[in-house]
């Protein structure tokens, strides 16, 4: 009976934490989705923004220097923070948000997957710090943040869940994070739908015929 009670308390605790992180991650991910879409649409309609790319790059570097955040800080830091007790600076989130939007606005090359992990990881790390969680629990809440922002950004809660569980270590899945991560992902995904954001889709226009030429 004591074991069941202990498990129930732990389960309820993590569902609550995961949902809270999912709400925050859903809002941030939805705003990020809107900002990137706006920046991309504006650039496509105003090609002169390409000439602003050098200035945007200088501004991004300047922002990192002013905020005293290493420019090389990125997805690797988030992964390291899950593996060990490495602190993630909170300022990393707005810097990644602004830097990615400016890059898309000026025609630069920047993927959204890494930005989603970094945004979510920063949110999760701060949540773990505020809740005074130990190293193991902090790692789990960081994964929840990663799942939440990824789900809100791409509209793929299941993919977000397993991506966050797998990206930490190649060939290893952190099954302990399944329930919290999927809870965060579903909450964040629902928020993105409420914000009017449709899941990202990629249309396949044609499938090449299978032949020696196509497989070599």
What do the PLM-derived regions correspond to, one by one?
Residues 1-216:
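Alpha-helical transmembrane segments and immediately membrane-proximal extracytoplasmic
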């Amino acid at each position: 009976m004591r074991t069941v009670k202990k498990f129930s308390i732990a389960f309820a605790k993590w569902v609550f934490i995961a949902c809270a992180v999912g709400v925050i991650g859903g809002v941030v991910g939805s705003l990020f989705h809107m900002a990137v879409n706006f920046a991309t649409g504006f650039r496509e309609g105003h090609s002169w923004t390409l000439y602003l790319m050098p200035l945007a790059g200088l501004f991004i570097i300047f922002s990192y220097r002013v905020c005293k955040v290493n420019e090389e800080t990125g997805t690797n830091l988030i992964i390291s923070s899950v593996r060990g007790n490495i602190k993630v600076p909170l300022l990393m989130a707005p810097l990644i948000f602004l830097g990615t939007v400016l890059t898309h606005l000026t025609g630069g090359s920047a993927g959204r997957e890494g930005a989603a992990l970094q945004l979510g990881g920063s949110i999760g790390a701060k949540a773990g710090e505020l809740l005074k969680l130990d190293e193991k629990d902090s790692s789990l809440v960081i994964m929840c943040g990663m799942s939440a922002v990824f789900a809100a950004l791409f509209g793929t809660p299941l993919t977000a869940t397993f991506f966050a569980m797998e990206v930490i270590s190649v060939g290893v899945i952190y099954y302990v994070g399944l329930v919290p991560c999927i809870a965060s992902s579903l909450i964040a995904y629902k928020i993105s739908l409420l914000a009017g954001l449709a899941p990202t889709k990629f249309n396949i226009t044609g499938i090449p015929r299978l032949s020696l030429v196509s497989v070599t």
